[in-house]
Amino acid sequence: MEVKEQLKLKELLFIMKQMPKTFKLIFTLERSLFLKLIRFSIITGILPIVSLYISQELINSLVTIRKEVSIVITIFLTYLGVSFFSELISQISEFYNGKFQLNIGYKLNYKVMKKSSNLALKDFENPEIYDKLERVTKEISYKPYQIIQAIITMTTSFVTLLSSIAFLMSWNPKVSLLLLVIPVISLFYFLKIGQEEFFIHWKRAGKERKSWYISYILTHDFSFKELKLYNLKDYLLNKYWDIKKSFIEQDTKILRKKTLLNLIYEIAVQLVGAVIIFIAIMSAFAGKIMVGNVMSYIRSVSLVQNHSQSIMTSIYSIYNSNLYMNQLYEFLELKEEKSQGHKKPIVEPIHSVVFQNVSFIYPNQGEQTLKHINVSLHKGERVAIVGPNGSGKKTFIKLLTGLYEVHEGDILINGINIKELDMDSYMNQIAALFQDFMKYEMTLKENIGFGQIDKLHQTNKMHEVLDIVRADFLKSHSSYQFDTQLGLWFDEGRQLSGGQWQKIALARAYFREASLYILDEPSSALDPIAEKETFDTFFSLSKDKIGIFISHRLVAAKLADRIIVMDKGEIVGIGTHEELLKTCPLYKKMDESENYMNPLEEEGSKWKEALYQG
């Protein structure tokens, strides 16, 4: 839906047309409970007028003193029975209402999380979609239930209103219709405020995300050291307050408008009600109606006033919530990663990868990130990818792993175009350690087992991969068990150093029985000895498989069978270390720069190579 600032009838009708979609969603999630609540709401709506009529008869029988005591007692007991029944229905309805709220909240959250997990990486890198996700998740805990609650409340109020109007019309039809005029007129203005409120929240989704981020870094451990060291607390608090202050001003303005409109509405309704009550009292004095009738008409007026207000508020709530629900539907209808359909599964290990004239451009960017990439990788090869920042190394890996779709050219896996492959079976053949690897605030077993989720309970294999990555810190502390909570977010969590987290992430990658291993800047959090151990393990595990690693340090790249040199999205050199020193000026410059950075140039280089070669 295109967002506009002026309320138009066609927009109102469009929003209200979302109702069938909302009912369909409700029926899909909780059909049985919803129908029960509607039935209870109808019964609840009828009971007030039934109770009112019985009380009228009771008062009239007492005033006239013409009826037998037994009849009066019968009417009284009937009144009590209706009251008890009304309370029973109310409590049962509250129970189902609470149950419905819990179920619908959990199921919708699950639906949104499932949808998020089915989106492509490019969607999470798109600010527009990220804002849409922010709007949806921010209000999902109450907005969908709010619209359902409004429907139920409106059903109850509508039944009560109709029965009350019918009761009053049996006395004075013309006067009764006056009670409906003001709510109908007021409804338009309430809807206009509702739209204004929605658009305010819609526009500030980006700022909401910024304020959440500031709050996040102020309240979590990963940023604590820099916040203290650079004394950022006051700056960030002020930045947060500036954002929230503008929100408070906007919300106060809306609140002021709502309060003023409510005041005008209540005064008008009370005046009309007073006129009707005055007419009823005069009719009683004239002997046209009895005292019990006057009391019941006064209560009927009150019921009409209250429930017309309730209906109007419910319509406002439905309209306002439907604006949100439209955002939810837009998110749920986002295009997902292509269905696997009848695509070909990988039935054997990956033995060849071929990039044929592959180019890639990020959305909303004019220049290609990768340009005409042609390269082949084969089983038994360990390949290093080097190049300056922004040269396209990580984009190459994201295309290879299927996280991005190829725009131009083809990637062939075992001779099959990657677009024709079943991506789940393909990704099952890949084990990767990304530079921004996950630190799951979960158990040690989960942190490792996520590498092969169907083997999560194979702790013997976990012991093996921990030995492979030489996670000695786990052996030296008897307190580390597979059910040990890692991180500090939850109770009894154990925090790890950056290098220890990386070893756990490496164990997760090696837990998978893959045929293509990828390491993205594996030395970023490791000391030289741990770095040497990491590459020893990598070269050992990737034997007879395909191994790829990105590195800024040529001392590790020298050990690869081949080195791919990238610059400005292009491959500018492929070969061994010695070959590239002769044929690739950029590689030679990188090698000279690395040696220059070592104060003991020649000795340092020899020491590093000796360390890597054992």
UniProtKB/Swiss-Prot annotation:
Family matches, as InterPro entries: AAA+_ATPase, ABC1_TM_dom, ABC1_TM_sf, ABC_transporter-like_ATP-bd, ABC_transporter-like_CS, P-loop_NTPase, Type_1_exporter
Principal location class: membrane
Chain sites annotated for binding ATP: 387-394
GO terms for MF: ABC-type transporter activity; ATP binding; ATP hydrolysis activity; ATPase-coupled lipid transmembrane transporter activity
Domain ABC transporter, residue spans: 353-593
Membrane topology: Multi-pass membrane protein
Bridged cysteine pairs (disulfide): none
Compartments where located: Cell membrane
Keyword entries, A-Z: ATP-binding, Bacteriocin transport, Cell membrane, Membrane, Nucleotide-binding, Protein transport, Transmembrane, Transmembrane helix, Transport
Keyword Signal: no
Domain of life: Bacteria
Protein name per Swiss-Prot or TrEMBL: Subtilin transport ATP-binding protein SpaT
